[in-house]
């Protein structure tokens, strides 16, 4: 299944990556285009005949937004569905009171969650990136992996349908614009895939966005790979623009992807070269990943200095963004 993503040595991967970067689309017949143009013209003519020359197409629906930021305060949402994805991961769906409203979450941003444990003096706050589409009305989804001694993830996994959770936001991260970069690389570990998936989905659902995307995603076991089907579907649909490389610390015998931790040899092989113009590298994952790859952030508003593997490979601070 992962034959195209196997990390055997640097040279085969580099050849695959070069082909992905330079292969031209195959020529196609123009007949379907002419047919489509003709049918479009006919449709416009019939529309004007029945509704008049001054008629215009219906404007897109402007939906209310659940989260507006600023001084809005906390919004309580009811848990409506629970889907078990693996031994330690669930997809939780929280519904909006207004079933026609959208979340108001932007690319790339997150929501702050809050709950107060019984007997505790302070509430627990944690940011989460929704995995549902930003244009989806009626609800939002969180993919949550439970961590030992992680108070918020343990609370979320203990929740039952019809219970409520407090949200606030959105919390803006990186302001994405169509074709802002020619090529982006995403380096993720564990649940760090969620903001990456948010960005990937936005790029490929926009027909005007031609950005190339390379994903390097590390996990402990195969069951830990979050959003696996969604990522594979996108890679199969856009093979010339999206490549994903998976690594497992504890792979099964039949695993054909990368083994071990995200390392310098792999990144040197699959990432765009530092000298390439108009590129950006995004990093998100546990502290150990940041330490090894890019260095940690100082604060949510301070990216800190670039260090680790990316600095060793010759990238500069402006080429890297740490979620």
Curated annotation (Swiss-Prot):
TM region positions: 30-46
Protein's recorded name: NADH-cytochrome b5 reductase 2
Residue ranges of every copy of the FAD-binding FR-type domain listed in the record: 72-177
Location, primary (coarse class): mitochondrion
Enzyme Commission number(s) of this protein: 1.6.2.2
GO MF entries: cytochrome-b5 reductase activity, acting on NAD(P)H
GO biological process, any: ergosterol biosynthetic process
Keywords recorded for this protein, A-Z: FAD, Flavoprotein, Membrane, Mitochondrion, Mitochondrion outer membrane, NAD, Oxidoreductase, Transmembrane, Transmembrane helix
Protein family membership: Belongs to the flavoprotein pyridine nucleotide cytochrome reductase family.
Membrane topology, record value: Single-pass membrane protein
Cofactor(s) the record lists: FAD
Origin superkingdom: Eukaryota
Flavoprotein keyword on record: yes
Catalysed conversion reaction: 2 Fe(III)-[cytochrome b5] + NADH = 2 Fe(II)-[cytochrome b5] + NAD(+) + H(+)
Binding site for FAD: 180-215
Entry GO CC: mitochondrial outer membrane
PROSITE patterns per record: FAD_FR
Location of this chain's protein in the cell: Mitochondrion outer membrane
Xref: InterPro entries: CBR-like, Cbr1-like_FAD-bd_dom, FAD-bd_FR_type, Flavoprot_Pyr_Nucl_cyt_Rdtase, FNR_nucleotide-bd, OxRdtase_FAD/NAD-bd, Riboflavin_synthase-like_b-brl
């Amino acid at each position: 299944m992962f034959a195209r993503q196997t990390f055997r040595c640097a040279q085969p991967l580099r050849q695959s990556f070069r082909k992905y970067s330079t292969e031209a689309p195959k020529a196609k017949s123009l007949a379907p285009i002419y047919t489509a143009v003709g049918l479009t013209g006919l449709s416009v003519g019939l529309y004007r005949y029945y509704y008049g020359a001054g008629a215009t197409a219906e404007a897109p629906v402007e939906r209310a937004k659940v989260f507006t930021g600023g001084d809005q305060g906390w919004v309580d949402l009811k848990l409506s569905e629970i889907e078990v994805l693996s031994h330690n991961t669930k997809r939780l769906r929280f519904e909006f009171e207004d079933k026609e409203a959208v979340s108001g979450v932007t690319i790339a941003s997150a929501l702050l969650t809050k709950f107060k444990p019984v007997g505790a003096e302070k509430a627990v706050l944690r940011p989460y990136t929704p995995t549902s589409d930003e244009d989806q009305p009626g609800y939002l989804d969180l993919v949550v992996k439970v961590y030992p001694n992680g108070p918020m993830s343990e609370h979320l996994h203990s929740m039952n349908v019809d219970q409520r959770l407090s949200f606030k936001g959105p919390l803006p991260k990186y302001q994405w614009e169509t074709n802002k970069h020619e090529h982006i690389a995403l380096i993720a570990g564990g649940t760090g895939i969620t903001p990456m998936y948010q960005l990937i989905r936005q790029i490929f659902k926009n027909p005007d966005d031609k950005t190339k995307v390379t994903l390097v995603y590390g996990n402990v076991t195969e069951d830990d790979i979050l959003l696996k089907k969604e990522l594979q579907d996108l890679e199969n649909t856009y093979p010339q623009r999206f490549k994903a490389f998976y690594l497992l610390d504890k792979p099964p015998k039949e695993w054909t992807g990368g083994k071990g931790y995200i390392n310098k040899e792999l990144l040197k092989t699959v990432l765009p070269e530092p000298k390439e113009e108009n590129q950006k590298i995004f990093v998100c994952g546990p502290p150990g990943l940041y330490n090894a790859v890019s260095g940690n952030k100082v604060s949510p508003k301070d990216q800190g200095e670039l260090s680790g593997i990316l600095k060793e490979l010759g990238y500069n601070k402006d080429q890297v963004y740490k979620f």
